[in-house]
Amino acid sequence: MLKIKNILTCAISISLFLMSSTAADATQTAEDLRNSDISKLVKQSKFDSRDYGIVTPVRDQGDTSLCWAYSTASASETSILRSGIDKSVDKSSLSLSPQQIGYARHNRGSDPLNNTTGEITSSSGNWSYAGGGTKYAAALLSTWCGPVKSDKAYNVNGWSNAAYKLESAISVDGKNLNKDAAAREKMKRAIVKYGAVTFSYNNVREAF
């Protein structure tokens, strides 16, 4: 069983390093990135994790409410490739199941590690439309209930089928990125150091 060094979750109003869905060929390797000086990379005018071959392909969530689970799975994949903890996978072969994350968020049992004591999950209807968030995902993965590989069934036992184990999750405050230079520096450093971040925002819909 391998351990994920870090999965980042953050709530930000503006994405700092925009990444398009167009695939790019890696110009350097993940090993090059691991051997680079983070402080120097942060000061560059541009940083793109795709240049190092650590960004997995874009996936379509369909009409589900699992954007947060897809984001968590993708950030986890990049973190794994960035850290180099699993030499048997690359950006083409590593695929974690967002469906398992979504299902387990609303259908899991007790936490054997007691990392989420007191948390109450209450949802009705189809779990794939029940919603969630990246902080909820970090809480779930802190119990080691997943992540599982995409070739597993979404309702598989997450504890016995976890492909990796989360060691820590880091939250970066991104509320003032467009005004606070120090906040932007911290966000840049997080992206460079861990390869990716997730972010959440609340889109309130009004009917007329």
Predicted regions span which residues?
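Catalytic-core signature of thiol
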Residues: 25-208
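Bacterial N-terminal signal peptides that target proteins for export
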Residues: 1-9
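Bacterial N-terminal signal peptides
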Residues: 10-19
